[in-house]
Amino acid sequence: MKRICSLFFSSIFFVSLVTFTSSVTAQELERDLIFTPNALPSESHTTSLNLQIRGGSPPMVLPFLDDFAWPSFFEESGVDRPELVRWDSSPVRRTSTFALNPPTIGVVTLDGLDADGYPYVFNSIDAHGWADTLTSREIYLGGLTTNDEVTLSFWYEGGGIGNAPDLGEDSLIVEFKSIGSEGDLWTRVWEDSLDVMSTDAFTQVVIPISDGIYLHNNFQFRFRNYGTLMGNADLWHIDYVFVAENGITGNPIEELAFQYPPFTLLRSFSAMPWTHYSDNPEFYINDTLVVGHTNFGMGPNNQENTGISIQLQDLDPIAFENEFIQNVSVSEGPFSTEYMADLLDAQGVPASILFNPASSDTTAVFEVSLWENEVGYYTNQSAVYDNDSIGFSQVFTDYYAYDDGTAEKAYALEATGGQLAVRYPLAIPDTLDGLLIHFTPFYDNAELETFVIKVWADDAGVPGEQVDTMYQFHSPQYFTEGYDLFAYYAYDNPVPVSGIIHVGFIQ
């Protein structure tokens, strides 16, 4: 019997990008993402450079704090900003879109991928074991006693948007390091094997560091996960790791923080061609941007003042200052704010034409920055790595995109001849040159399998007749240079298109 090989992918570009959430039939497969290429700086997958930290830096002093909003791995900051580094190198990555309801923007995610972004055990259907390890830098605890009430606290969640750990099979543990006569000794001090784990909310854990064997000058702690070794599944997310004296309650320092990174100010798309946007800018701009925050504590900083700025790349800023929430009290815990309502720039231009069509004739990229100034000042930087200021690029070039470009799961058609399409309403007539698709390896290497890319006209909301005939066979291309990279697949010939179209492939 002929074996049918499924092509697992997670996103497609029409010269565009979309993550599929279609319903699954008997001839379709949906799988948690088993492979993710190597990390980009924003979602860093650390590699083994490490001893430059353990061998070249003195132990850290308390308090130890990391909410994973800044680049705290050596591979991100070790050379230029060693004071930001909190961790020894490990096969762990910072993510900002995998978790649900995180305390602050950015978490660290433990999974079944190694330091190169490949499964620890590839081409296997059932491989479990110890996977990722995240180890702190050495911390100076010498001279402290039980009376100092040193504690480790953190927040954690299983699964989130990705695949959750399996009941009775997977676990997350914490270990402390003591010094024995024969070297370092690691002792398990906490474990969650799904007895109390939540897949859509974070739980706080507080662990006393009270035993005298841990109160030494080279103390370290580490997180380890036991689960699948086959890729990006059985996910554990950790946030707001805090070690301090007098910290028995585990309360962090008082502050306001963002929860998620926004990725678009457009109504439906995350990116679109500049000439298409310019045809009707007020239609495509969103009328609001709701952003989630967390308020830790109810002290003097529970007055929130927010701002937003837009800057055309390589040009002077276009000043937008959103202060309509100025001096408003916010409740403790999660809350949200709207950044677009009643927003005007210095010349009174409304937010409905936030990205001025006069900025360019062909393409434009805008840097969008949002901030909270509960600390008493604004920042004009773009994409600041901090939990009270965030940024993203709003891209207008030559493609349409729907989502944020992060692939949490893989999707496939199981049957030969299976067809898949994504719907795009075009602003103006244009010519379609090709698709960008992110494929992910799943069990079998599908590089020798083939598919044909297609484009269909719309028929009452579903694909209708093929717009053009395509014959060119393509094969999946995989990358190891970074996360969520896309391969370009050109149509046999440029295709004139207008109105609503559907793009995809037949395998």
Map each language-model feature to its residues.
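Extracellular glycan-recognition surfaces and repeat-rich motifs
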Residues: 28-33, 37-123, 167-169
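Surface-exposed, low-complexity/disordered Ser/Thr/Gly/Pro/Asn-rich loops and linkers
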Residues: 86-149, 160-162, 237, 406-411
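Short beta-strands within extracellular/lumenal beta-sheet-rich domains
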Residues: 126-147, 151, 203-206, 413-426, ...
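Extracellular carbohydrate recognition
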Residues: 127-133, 166-167, 216, 227-245
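Extracellular carbohydrate recognition and processing domains
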Residues: 182-214, 467-490
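Short, well-structured beta-strand segments enriched in hydrophobic/aromatic residues
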Residues: 217-224, 356-371, 435, 487-507
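Beta-sheet-rich sandwich/jelly-roll-like modules and their strand-loop junctions
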Residues: 373-461, 500, 507
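Aromatic- and Gly/Pro-enriched, solvent-exposed loop/edge beta-strand patches characteristic
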Residues: 449-507
